[in-house]
Swiss-Prot record:
PANTHER family: C-1-TETRAHYDROFOLATE SYNTHASE, CYTOPLASMIC, C-1-TETRAHYDROFOLATE SYNTHASE, CYTOPLASMIC-RELATED. GO terms for biological process: L-histidine biosynthetic process; methionine biosynthetic process; purine nucleotide biosynthetic process; tetrahydrofolate interconversion. It comes from Shewanella loihica (strain ATCC BAA-1088 / PV-4). This is Bifunctional protein FolD. GO terms for molecular function: methenyltetrahydrofolate cyclohydrolase activity; methylenetetrahydrofolate dehydrogenase (NADP+) activity. Pathway: One-carbon metabolism; tetrahydrofolate interconversion. The lineage of its organism: Bacteria, Pseudomonadati, Pseudomonadota, Gammaproteobacteria, Alteromonadales. InterPro entries: Aminoacid_DH-like_N_sf (IPR046346), NAD(P)-bd_dom_sf (IPR036291), THF_DH/CycHdrlase (IPR000672), THF_DH/CycHdrlase_cat_dom (IPR020630), THF_DH/CycHdrlase_CS (IPR020867), THF_DH/CycHdrlase_NAD-bd_dom (IPR020631). Gene3D superfamilies: Leucine Dehydrogenase, chain A, domain 1, NAD(P)-binding Rossmann-like Domain. GO terms for cellular component: cytosol. Homodimer. Its EC number is 1.5.1.5, 3.5.4.9. The keyword Repeat does not apply. Belongs to the tetrahydrofolate dehydrogenase/cyclohydrolase family. PROSITE patterns: THF_DHG_CYH_2. The gene is folD.
Length: 284
């Protein structure tokens, strides 16, 4: 068996085209274009790349993108004041603060300062709570994008044994909630998990988000499983690899995401979808 590749790049491009058409229709109807504020604190190279991609994606679909690049030494109070300003700006539908933040700034305080109706990253406790209660509105972008990828396979998720490896607030925990909502019997694995191999081998649907190159051996993959690899790791050779040993896993799986070109583009597409949703449902 050779797995079908789930082409996140192509699916994300299709979503962007649809969003662009909706923005054009809004303008023709005399409505304003959706606005996204992107806040970057410091000069972390990876964060700069991610932020650049998000800003370009905004422009591509016709959103208004407002950029705030702040120095590393920016105080927590100054960052919170900027968020307050964006909260009150009627031209801004979504506020994105690029994580991680410098050590002197408390992430949870920043996330909770963003108004829930402008929390297009889906990190605010209100929005995570709505997902937990099975009434999601603004959903965490990476898990939301992953659900779109899974849907693209045409496989019915109800009753599947799903395993999530990684329990971060950004991916693992909201991913578990998304899979429960999709009717899966879901196991979340983390650093205290015993016998990880046994759990992975049982997975009809495997999602790995740990940030360790080739962490899951390919031979652990159950024949016919769907494999979603969230990791993106650069080896010393410069090669980008995921958290799953791709070549061997692709021999066992029915569907698999590549790295790069799998989950990454979908995270940005979901961010754009959330921003349009916020504009249409909260701010029009």
């Amino acid at each position: 068996m050779t797995a079908q590749i789930i082409d996140g790049k192509a699916i994300a491009q299709s979503i962007r085209k649809q969003l662009s058409a909706k923005v054009t229709a809004r303008k023709e109807a005399g409505k304003r274009v959706p606005g996204l504020a992107v806040i970057l604190v410091g000069a972390d190279p990876a964060s700069q790349v991610y932020v650049g991609s998000k800003r370009r994606a905004c422009e591509e679909v016709g959103f208004l993108s407002q950029s705030f690049d702040l120095p590393t030494e920016t105080s927590e109070a100054d960052l919170l004041a900027l968020i307050d300003k964006c909260n009150e700006d009627p031209s801004i539908d979504g506020i994105l603060v690029q994580l991680p933040l410098p050590d002197h700034i408390e992430e949870s305080k920043v996330i909770e300062r963003i108004r829930p109706d402008k929390d297009v990253d889906g990190f605010h406790p209100y929005n995570v709570g709505r997902l937990a209660q099975r009434i999601p509105v603004l959903r965490s972008c990476t898990p939301m994008g992953i659900m779109t990828l899974i849907k693209s396979t045409g496989v019915d998720t109800y009753g599947l044994d799903a395993v999530v490896v990684g329990a971060s607030n950004i991916v693992g925990r909201p991913m578990t909630l998304e899979l429960l909502l999709a009717g899966c019997t879901t196991t979340t694995c983390h650093r205290f998990t015993r016998d990880l191999e046994d759990k992975v081998r049982r997975a009809d649907l495997l999602i790995v988000a740990v940030g360790k190159p080739n962490f899951i051996p390919g031979e652990w993959i159950k024949p016919g499983a769907i494999v979603i690899d969230v990791g993106i790791n650069r080896l010393e050779s410069g090669q980008l690899v995921g958290d799953v040993q791709y070549d061997v896993a692709a021999e066992h799986a029915s569907h698999i995401t590549p790295v790069p070109g799998g989950v990454g583009p979908m995270t940005i597409a979901s961010l754009l979808e959330n921003t349009l949703y916020a504009a249409e449902n909260y701010h029009d």
